[in-house]
């Protein structure tokens, strides 16, 4: 099954491709829409994932997959939330520094990564799946692997950040992995819709 990857984010593509490829699902990444054309006006991760997937499916008349993800920190919930990528407005490193600064006098450092995956068909049909990864915010930036908030996020049961644990651990345990697992569990329903309804 071929699905358009509805994002320009190379890191997300690599992570999702490694998870989906063994299941005979091929991500097509050479389909691009100027991000300025897609207004992520949703108030939830699910809504924004649906907006992106629907835009690509409609433009290219093909099934599209999109994700919207971020981190929710209990002490300042619902932030950074859907604003995770642009929390500081100055990129990943400054986002992380801002979080550490906001939490410096707070005991509660619990946090969770959230990922919403949306599969959209050109006819408007959409399937959505959510995954979470629980953990805590570190006291300092640690590790150079990964991207986003990985250098300050310590998964439950670990002492290292995702930035230290690396891609092998993340591929198996991340919020994106959990969301994609939920998608894969429902894969037959999606394939049936593709074969017997949309392609009819």
Curated annotation (Swiss-Prot):
GO-annotated molecular function: dITP diphosphatase activity; ITP diphosphatase activity; metal ion binding; nucleotide binding; ribonucleoside triphosphate phosphatase activity; XTP diphosphatase activity
Cofactor: Mg(2+)
Keyword Transmembrane: no
Catalyzed reaction equations: XTP + H2O = XMP + diphosphate + H(+); dITP + H2O = dIMP + diphosphate + H(+); ITP + H2O = IMP + diphosphate + H(+)
Pfam families, per database record: Ham1p_like
EC id: 3.6.1.66
GO biological process, one term: nucleotide metabolic process
Note on how the cofactor is bound: Binds 1 Mg(2+) ion per subunit.
UniProt-annotated binding residues for Mg(2+): 68
Gene3D superfamilies tied to this protein: 3.90.950.10
Enzyme class, UniProt record, top EC level: hydrolase
SUPFAM superfamilies linked: ITPase-like (SSF52972)
Keywords assigned by UniProt, alphabetized: Hydrolase, Magnesium, Metal-binding, Nucleotide metabolism, Nucleotide-binding
Top-rank taxon, per record: Bacteria
GO (cellular component) term, any one: cytosol
Record-annotated active site: 68
Positions with a binding annotation for substrate: 7-12, 69, 147-150, 170, 175-176
Function: Pyrophosphatase that catalyzes the hydrolysis of nucleoside triphosphates to their monophosphate derivatives, with a high preference for the non-canonical purine nucleotides XTP (xanthosine triphosphate), dITP (deoxyinosine triphosphate) and ITP. Seems to function as a house-cleaning enzyme that removes non-canonical purine nucleotides from the nucleotide pool, thus preventing their incorporation into DNA/RNA and avoiding chromosomal lesions.
Subunit structure: Homodimer.
Similarity section: Belongs to the HAM1 NTPase family.
Name of protein: dITP/XTP pyrophosphatase
Species assigned in the record: Acholeplasma laidlawii (strain PG-8A)
